[in-house]
Regions:
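Alpha-helical heptad-repeat coiled-coil segments that mediate oligomerization/polymerization in large
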Residues: 6-16, 20-23, 27-83, 97, ...
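Phosphate-proximal small/polar/acidic motifs at interfaces that engage nucleotide phosphates
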Residues: 58, 67-172
Length: 172
């Protein structure tokens, strides 16, 4: 470097100091960008969870009407179509397993195993939430008193957002 070759040269020192300041400024800007991205993704996760919970409650309402209709007739066919559209919408947000009952309703569980927390069971909707703790996003799901942390949210929009959030936290 020019400073090593001419330690008494003030111009070389000034250039090195300015380059150091520029380098520090670039890192500071990158850190701010990562923090902004993290905040943005956290907001997207919250919006996704809110929409997902609304969709799950909508499906529970459709299934209540379907059960009341007795599972037959034109009204039931329309409700079955609504049920299927609602399940498709929910499946975009999270991977799920669906178990269709004889009366036309479906039980949805989180994840592909069929053993995950209930999302919708008959006329009842579960709850999904996400907690941001120690640089990690943790999914909680279930019904009533059995809402617990789960690792079953491995696909869909929610899983993608959580993966992005976790990667940014590891980077920052």
């Amino acid at each position: 470097s020019s400073i090593a070759q001419a330690p008494g040269d003030l111009a070389g020192r000034v250039v090195a100091l300015e380059q150091g300041k520029s380098f520090a400024s670039a890192f500071s800007s990158l850190a701010e960008s990562l923090e902004g991205l993290k905040t943005s993704i956290e907001g997207e996760i919250k919006n996704t969870v809110s929409t997902l919970n609304t969709e799950m409650h909508g499906l529970a309402d459709i299934q209540a009407k379907l059960i009341s209709a007795g599972g037959s007739g034109n009204a039931a066919n329309s409700l079955l179509d609504q049920r299927d559209k609602s399940i498709a919408a929910i499946s975009e947000f999270v991977g799920l397993s669906a178990d269709y009952k004889l009366r036309g309703d479906a039980t949805l569980t989180l994840g592909s195993t069929g053993n995950g927390p209930f999302l919708v069971q008959s006329k009842s909707a579960g709850v999904i939430s996400v907690a941001f703790e120690e640089g990690k996003a943790t999914v909680y799901a279930g019904t009533g008193a059995s809402i617990t942390a789960t690792k079953q949210a491995t696909s869909g929009v929610l899983a993608g957002l959580i993966s992005a959030y976790d990667i940014i936290n590891q980077t920052g």
